[in-house]
Amino acid sequence: MAKTGMYVGLDIGTTSVKVVVAEYIEGQMNIIGVGNAKSDGLNRGIVVDIDQTVQAIQRAVRQAEEKAGIQIKSVNVGLPANLLEVESCQGMIAVSSESKEITDEDVRNVASAALVRSTPPERQIVAILPQDFTVDGFEGIKDPRGMLGVRMEMFGVVYTGPKTIIHNIRKCVEKAGLGINELVITPLALTETILTDGEKDFGTIVIDMGGGQTTTSVIHDKQLKFTHVNQEGGEFITKDISIVLNTSFNNAEALKINYGDAYPERTSANEEFPVDVIGKSEPVRVDERYLSEIIEARVEQILRKSKEVLDEIDAFELPGGVVLTGGAASMPGIVDLAQEIFEANVKLYVPNHMGLRNPVFANVISIVEYSAQLNDIYHIAKYAIPGEKSKPAQSVAVQQEVRYDTYAEQPQEEYEEFNERESGEKVTGKIKDFFSNIFD
């Protein structure tokens, strides 16, 4: 059961920055504030302009503060999976106290012993997750505090990431005037919170299709075993539409949202709509099937890249199938196309919160839920990581009376609209055919 209190999640995405404020009362999560601001400071999930990213964070935070009636002081911020590495770790110590009763200090010491490793200078430890402990040969202990023992071992998982990415995210958040309670690995939070216990135990693939990149994750035995980032996302679909139809990026985005379908067999060549073409005085009629074929080409390329890396580790043998989420995954037809490509059971995850029933909010909600579920053992072990502070900051300061009902009053249309940014990546495969045929 989640702790009681207020939790704030921050998801810094390529196309938007999202903030969610949630109040937990007796384990019930109630979302009381949401912010969503266009992001101009990232490219393919990586911060490329700190000042613009800071401004987007501040806009999203202000929106959430106004709706929740609180002042946000610190956040739980998501960390992308770019160049993330996962390793097993093990540590062993002698219990230090004379009474041989295991204390918080012993747990921290055994976590420190597990972190004794040679970490390359360009990388740093992001998180350590204790799995279980062994006390004097007794295995499978989840919380050894208060037990008697002479020798204690800890088995867990350690995650490391590039210092540059981590530093830039921290810098943006701190420059926006916020503290950081938890730096949460986004695919870890996603797989932990959107899957059932059975899916996490027996093994499931999660594909998060964002605006600037697609993250493929595999969870098995309730552990995040594998992540892979493909630097293609929803904004690439928009870019393809813009180039092939010779229309502006904004028009292409509107076409994708209003008429887009990733599975041409579901569309009709008889259904047409007008497109404002650059260099022409009158709109050009384009049929629904042709637009769908443009979209299908890019989506198929993205999904096949995921399939390649998943085939290498035999991930499709896991019984949990594939779960799609993220803003780009909400397009009609993607589940059908994914089932055809993966030859596996595929489903779309949509958050079950009033006003936020859109996969685009899956990450930020997962960050909140994951942070709220972290236990004492995690926090004790976390302070064994070099540079971690001993106490988290207070998340919010209440400015006015807060309503703790579920977040249903704010219509989704109020969220700031945004257009996905342009990308210069060279398009391959079937997309090349569109670019050549358009001039025939």
UniProtKB/Swiss-Prot annotation:
Principal subcellular localization: membrane
Alphabetical list of SMART domains matching this protein: FtsA
Gene Ontology biological process terms, A to Z: FtsZ-dependent cytokinesis
InterPro entries cross-referenced by the UniProt entry: ATPase_NBD, Cell_div_FtsA, FtsA/MreB, FtsA_C, SHS2_FtsA
GO cellular component, as recorded: cell division site; cytoplasmic side of plasma membrane
Recorded coiled-coil stretches: none
Pfam families per record: FtsA, FtsA_C, SHS2_FTSA
SUPFAM superfamilies given in the database record: Actin-like ATPase domain
Protein localization: Cell membrane
Membrane topology summary: Peripheral membrane protein
Keywords for this protein: Cell cycle, Cell division, Cell membrane, Membrane
HAMAP family tied to this protein: FtsA
Functional summary from the UniProt entry: Cell division protein that is involved in the assembly of the Z ring. May serve as a membrane anchor for the Z ring.
Family from the record: Belongs to the FtsA/MreB family.
Subunit structure: Self-interacts. Interacts with FtsZ.
Name recorded for this polypeptide: Cell division protein FtsA
The gene coding this protein: ftsA
